[in-house]
UniProtKB/Swiss-Prot annotation:
It is a multi-pass membrane protein. This is FAD-dependent monooxygenase penM. Its cofactor is FAD. Its EC number is 1.-.-.-. The gene is penM. It is an enzyme of class 1 (oxidoreductase).
Length: 465
């Protein structure tokens, strides 16, 4: 059958949804995007990290050259501790050399604007389109909008975020609820004007007890920042905290004098803000990604903290894999795919994506607790091992990046470097586990009053790499 006879309905004009629209357009597959907001790129104060695995797909879609005009590649990361000790790492620069794409940040609003403005047929992107019901049959699926408009398609994709309507309808149709999402941290995030002393192309990570402040210094000194705090207890979705503008004030006032880099305080960051907001940080990878002719992608399927910077990149990879599987299936069809064929395809999609996403999610869970010095393990690991780890942070990031997915029906980017093959099947997992085992041993010894063994950890690990 012609690919344009198969119709995909994308719920959500998010980064996930708009990237999928670009992927489907390149594959020649008919689709429409339904976005409930009245504008395509609202400013909510958020920034987005584009890592090489996401950049590579965006390059395939001929979008990355435009994105490059608004980013400043990171070259250095500085990490600081409550006792005043600081060290710097060039791992971001090393990652760029290995993969041909940098680690970089830009306004979430700007990325959405690029995705929207460079989409060739804007009649396919419907704004102010609020879904009120979803029905699925053995032949097709139907979505009814608040204004009474009805859309019919062969597949519904939920790219509608952490509070996904499609996910809720999917659970209802499957007659099961599959929650598991929890919240233990909150995040105040924002964008500020340049601040003297914060150097373009650098990232600052300030680790305190149950508090992390991260700043990324982008194009022309624009500062993207996160303030992450541990909450009073663990919350289980949907009973999660919501924060209003009034609630941010007292928290900010309490932290204004905190110095996160040399003599620069959080108050300076706050006072120079252009925009800021506060949210709970949900964490989960859902087990159920599809049912019938409905499937999830992006934050509707998996939600992680911003510490690892992979949230948007995972959504971009989702779009690449789902569109590749659809393109391959439709090339072989003379008739619209049956329910069984759709279910097989969606099972393949989950089989490809779930293990990779889950692995990165676990790293994200570790990082948010490690950076917030949550417990003696993370406190000692951060203070006494991390400053002497050498290239291990770059190696771990490389392992994560190298497994990235591509649009199988589009040419691979020519700018890719040696790291994609070198680190795809590297044995870094063994090194990480060795670090953890040694650190646990060190903790035992430290309890007996012998801290010297902790200082020997980097030497012992380097012997195993």
């Amino acid at each position: 059958m012609d690919k344009d006879q198969f119709h995909v309905i994308i719920v959500g004009g998010s980064i996930a949804g708009l990237t999928l629209a670009h992927c489907l357009h390149r594959a020649g597959i008919s689709h429409v995007v339904l976005e409930k907001a009245s504008e395509p790129a609202p400013q909510i104060g958020a920034s987005i990290g584009i890592l090489p695995n996401g950049a590579r797909v965006l390059d395939q879609l001929q979008l990355y050259e435009t994105i490059e005009q608004y980013i400043e590649p990171l070259e250095t990361a500085t990490i600081g501790y409550p006792d005043g000790f600081r060290f710097s790492s060039s791992y971001p620069k090393l990652v760029n050399e290995r993969f041909g794409f940098p680690i970089a940040f830009l306004d979430r609003q700007k990325l959405l604007e690029i995705l929207y403005q460079h989409y060739p047929d804007k009649s396919r992107i419907r704004l102010a389109a609020r879904v009120v019901s979803i029905e699925s049959s053995s032949i097709d699926s139907t979505i009814t909008m608040e204004d009474g408009t009805i859309y019919k398609g062969h597949l519904i994709v939920g790219a509608d975020g952490v509070h996904s309507r499609v996910r809720a309808e999917m659970w209802k149709a499957a007659q099961r609820i599959n929650p598991g999402m929890t919240v233990e941290y909150s995040c105040i995030f924002g964008i500020s004007a340049p601040i003297k002393g914060l150097i373009v192309g650098e990232q600052v990570n300030a680790f305190f007890d149950h508090l992390t402040i991260v700043t990324i210094h982008g194009k022309k000194g624009r500062v993207y920042w996160f303030l992450i705090q541990k909450l009073d207890r663990k919350y289980v979705y949907p009973e999660c905290p919501r924060f209003t503008a009034k609630e941010i004030g007292p928290i900010v006032n309490h932290l204004k004098e905190v110095k996160f880099f040399k003599d620069i305080t959080f108050g300076q960051l706050w006072d120079s803000r252009e925009t800021a907001s506060m949210t709970a940080l949900e964490e989960n990878v859902f087990d159920t990604w599809y049912h019938g002719r409905m499937v999830l992608m992006g934050d509707s399927a998996h939600k992680m903290t911003p510490n690892i910077g992979q949230g948007a990149n995972m959504a971009i990879e989702d779009a690449a894999v789902l569109s590749s599987l659809l393109s391959d299936l439709l090339q072989k069809q003379t008739q619209p795919p049956t329910n069984a064929q759709i279910e097989k395809l969606l099972a393949q999609y989950r089989e490809v994506r779930h293990p990779r996403v889950n692995s990165i999610y676990k790293t994200s869970r570790f990082l948010v607790r490690f950076q917030a010095r949550d417990g003696i393990f993370n406190t000692l690991f951060g203070r006494y091992y991390a400053p002497h780890a050498g290239d291990l942070p770059a190696d771990m990031a490389s392992k994560t990046i190298a497994g990235g997915e591509l649009c199988a029906y589009l040419p691979s980017p020519s700018r890719c470097s040696y790291g994609w093959e070198k680190y795809k099947n590297s044995g870094l997992g063994r090194t990480v586990w060795c670090v953890l085992v040694l650190l646990l041993s060190a903790l035992t010894w430290s309890c007996l009053g012998n801290m010297n063994i902790i200082m020997e950890l980097p030497k012992r690990v380097s012997m195993m790499r």
